[in-house]
Amino acid sequence: MRFLIDTANVEEIREIHEWGVLAGVTTNPSLVAKEGRDFVETLKEILDIVDGPISAEVISTDAKGMIEEGEKLAALSKNIVIKLPMTAEGLKATKYFAKRKIRTNVTLVFSANQALLAARAGASFVSPFLGRLDDIGQDGMQLIEDIAEIFSVHGIDTEIIAASVRHPVHVTEAARRGSHFATIPAKVFKQLIAHPLTDSGLEKFLADWASMQK
């Protein structure tokens, strides 16, 4: 499983990119609004940092508007992936872009049927939302497993991006159950790298070394 960062904050992207683990970036209108910056200028800056898929979401709700927005975004770089909602209009736009070999990420997926529809419309990626399913008492991890199994059985190339990741267990389980990517907030990346035994072990090594120098 590969790692994406879920943010529109350029400094967070730059920081995690320096670790050498980032395959790409996902953004959405909420994340962009939080930063209070021009969307296109932000994307250009992200493209300069990360050489990988950058999911940029449209805000139109009709296929025509999604296509118009998506074409402008796709013109920025071959690394731009058009992020579309899991709706009938979103599927129409997905089909349009698939025919033109422009990659798409169908988002707000909450069922295996939705994922299968998106894949058959030509989606490059589907993004099932784990945390939001947990919030309503449903099993987001089982959804990842179901989608992975269905795609495998039917030879579907669409890749799974585990989204709405809230904590490290989501990451471990998504990897274990067949997700191709997890898109993770910077805060959770920092939780992934931390472990108290790592910290205490490092402190002991340094203390032992210091005692040798006396």
UniProtKB/Swiss-Prot annotation:
Free-text function comment from the UniProt entry: Transaldolase is important for the balance of metabolites in the pentose-phosphate pathway.
Transmembrane segments: none
Compartments where located: Cytoplasm
Molecular function GO terms recorded: aldehyde-lyase activity; transaldolase activity
Pathway note: Carbohydrate degradation; pentose phosphate pathway; D-glyceraldehyde 3-phosphate and beta-D-fructose 6-phosphate from D-ribose 5-phosphate and D-xylulose 5-phosphate (non-oxidative stage): step 2/3
EC number(s) from the headed UniProt entry: 2.2.1.2
GO BP, sorted A to Z: carbohydrate metabolic process; pentose-phosphate shunt
Top EC class for this record: transferase
InterPro entries: Aldolase_TIM, TAL/FSA, Transaldolase_3B, Transaldolase_3B/F6P_aldolase, Transaldolase_AS, TSA/FSA_arc/bac
Source domain of life: Bacteria
A Pfam family this chain is assigned to: TAL_FSA
CDD domains: Transaldolase_FSA
Major location (coarse): cytoplasm
Originating species: Brevibacillus brevis (strain 47 / JCM 6285 / NBRC 100599)
Keywords: Cytoplasm, Pentose shunt, Schiff base, Transferase
Record family assignment: Belongs to the transaldolase family. Type 3B subfamily.
Cross-referenced PROSITE patterns: TRANSALDOLASE_1, TRANSALDOLASE_2
Gene3D superfamilies to which the protein is assigned, alphabetical: Aldolase class I
Protein name as annotated: Probable transaldolase
Cellular component GO terms held in the UniProt record: cytoplasm
Active site per database record: K83 (schiff-base intermediate with substrate)
Catalysed transformations (reactions): D-sedoheptulose 7-phosphate + D-glyceraldehyde 3-phosphate = D-erythrose 4-phosphate + beta-D-fructose 6-phosphate
